[in-house]
């Protein structure tokens, strides 16, 4: 077997060195490298340009936080993003409404979480969505209550997704899930409950609404718009 020993291999018409070998066994290719057959790599590879596999450019993104995944909103720019993004919890202890804004346009699901939420009166709670501003019309919504004291009752609303909490001193726990159906149309479903004195109440949430654009905000308020929040915490998660 013959051995070819050379530091540099250059094509007669090439202006650059095609292949450069060093004493450690490393090989540098001056320009493009095409492999027609199979290639096995047992060491580490560093790619400083674009790597194309099967005609598609491959981009490597290393998540910067445990539990994150590489994510792109346009297929070109990638970032380290949490699989489920948790909002900042808000104490529902004052005011007539609680807003969560800045929801990204790529979001397909939002979970609204209630932890001991109460208001000053008996007006049912509402979850309203928005794009640029809060939408307060056009909802098809039904909310049921199974009450330990008054039995079963159902209410509807066109102003938001209704939580039919019609008894005083309700401290509501549970969640409502908002799902993107198609375009800017969202559907809602949820199950919540509370214990009021010696009675136990359960609530259902359902409905749909079409927004004018991409969802970017969620508001929690009441049907009459005047009852104030006086206990609990509300937060959202989106994905």
What are these regions (language model features)?
Residues 1-80:
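Intrinsic low-complexity, repeat-rich intrinsically disordered segments enriched
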Residues 12, 18-20, 26, 68, ...:
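Surface-exposed molecular-recognition determinants
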């Amino acid at each position: 077997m013959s051995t070819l020993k050379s530091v540099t291999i250059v094509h007669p018409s090439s202006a650059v060195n095609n292949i450069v070998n060093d004493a450690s066994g490393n090989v540098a290719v001056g320009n493009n490298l095409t492999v027609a057959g199979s290639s096995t790599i047992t060491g580490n590879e560093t790619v400083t340009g674009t790597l194309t596999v099967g005609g598609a450019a491959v981009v490597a993104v290393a998540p910067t936080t445990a539990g994150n995944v590489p994510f792109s909103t346009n297929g070109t720019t990638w970032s380290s993003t949490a699989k489920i993004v948790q909002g900042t919890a808000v104490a529902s202890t004052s005011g007539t409404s609680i807003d969560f804004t800045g929801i990204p346009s790529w979001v397909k699901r939002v979970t609204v979480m209630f932890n001991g939420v109460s208001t000053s009166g008996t007006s049912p709670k509402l979850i309203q969505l928005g794009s640029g501003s809060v939408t307060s019309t056009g909802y098809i919504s039904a909310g049921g209550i199974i009450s330990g004291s008054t039995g079963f009752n159902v209410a509807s609303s066109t102003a938001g997704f209704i939580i039919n909490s019609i008894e005083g001193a309700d401290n509501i726990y549970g969640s409502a899930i908002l799902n993107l159906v198609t375009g800017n149309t969202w559907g809602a479903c949820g199950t919540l409950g509370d214990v009021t004195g010696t009675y136990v109440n359960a609530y259902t949430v359902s409905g749909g609404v079409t927004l004018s654009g991409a969802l970017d905000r969620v508001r929690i308020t009441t049907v009459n718009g005047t009852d104030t929040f006086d206990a609990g915490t509300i937060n959202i998660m989106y994905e």
